[in-house]
Amino acid sequence: MAASVAPGVRTLWWAGAAWLRQGGIRELFRPRIEGSTPGRDFSLSHYQSTVIVERWWKVPLAGEGRKPHLHRRHRVYKLVEDTKHRPKDNLELILTQSVDEIGVRGDLVSVKKSVGRNKLLSQGLAVYASPENRKLFEEEKSLRREGKLEKIQTKAGEATVKFLRSCHLEVGMKNNVKWELNPEIVARHFFKNLGVVVAPHALRLPEEPITRWGEYWCDVTVNGLDTVRVPMSVVLFQKPKTKRYKHWLAQQAAKSVAPTNPQAV
C-alpha cells in the first residue's frame, strides 16, 4: 500500500519546483553582493583526486594514420588504484630552532605535512629543505665544528637533560667499612640504577666529603653545555636478590591472593 502525502507537503513541493523553474537555480548559485539579500552558500569546488583505471577489453590496432574504432565495450573500465588511499609522503624540513621530540637547529627532519605546515612552518620553527637552505645550514654546522660559532645542545643531549630533571639517584654504601663518596662511585650508580652513562669529570659533588647516609645532590653537565642538579640519597647497601628468590616471592604472593576452594561435603 503506497503511503499518502499530506496536501500541505504536496503544495510546498510544487511551489518549490515552480520557483526553481522560474530562475531559482540561478538565484541559488548567484554570487553574493554586499547590501543585497543574503544568498545561499555552496561549495562548488570539486574533490581533486586521481583514479587509475584500465580498459576491460583491449582496443584493436588501427592502421597507420587512423584512429582506433571504439565500440561500446571499449568504454568499460576496471579500477586499478584509487590514489587517495596511498600513504601520504612526509615533508622534509630544516629546523631553525630546537623543538621537543623532533630535533635541534640545523637538523633535517621528515614530518607529516599537517605538522610541518601547521606547527613548524607557520611558527617559524623550520624552513623548506631547498638546496640553498641545505647549503646554508651545512656551512653553519662546519663553523660550529671549527669553534667559530657557539655550540648548541644535540637532540640526544636535550633528551638526557629532560630525563635527568625527573630522576632521583639512590647510592647504596656498606656499613662495615669506612667510605667516602666520590664521582667514580656516583657514575657507576648512574649507569646501574638509571641507565645513564655519565663521565666522572662531568659530575660535581658537594664540597664537604660525603661519609654518612643521607640526602645530598650532584650536578651533571651534559656535553659541557647544560647542568642539571639531581637529588641523591645515600642509603644502606642491600645485596641484590637472585632471580630464583624473586620467582619464589612471586609464587608466594600468588598463593596468598588466589581464593581457596571450599571443601566438598
Swiss-Prot record:
Keyword Flavoprotein among record annotations: no
Disulfide-linked positions: none
One GO MF term attached to the UniProt entry: structural constituent of ribosome
Subcellular location as annotated: Mitochondrion
Pfam family, one: bL9m_N
Domain of life per record: Eukaryota
Annotated Gene3D superfamilies: Ribosomal protein L9, N-terminal domain
One BP term from GO: mitochondrial translation
Targeting presequence: 1-49
SUPFAM superfamilies found in the cross-reference section: L9 N-domain-like
GO CC terms, sorted: mitochondrial inner membrane; mitochondrial large ribosomal subunit; mitochondrion
Keywords for this protein: Mitochondrion, Ribonucleoprotein, Ribosomal protein, Transit peptide
Family: Belongs to the bacterial ribosomal protein bL9 family.
Family annotation (PANTHER family): 50S RIBOSOMAL PROTEIN L9
Subunit note: Component of the mitochondrial ribosome large subunit (39S) which comprises a 16S rRNA and about 50 distinct proteins.
Record's protein name: Large ribosomal subunit protein bL9m
Organism per entry: Mus musculus (Mouse)
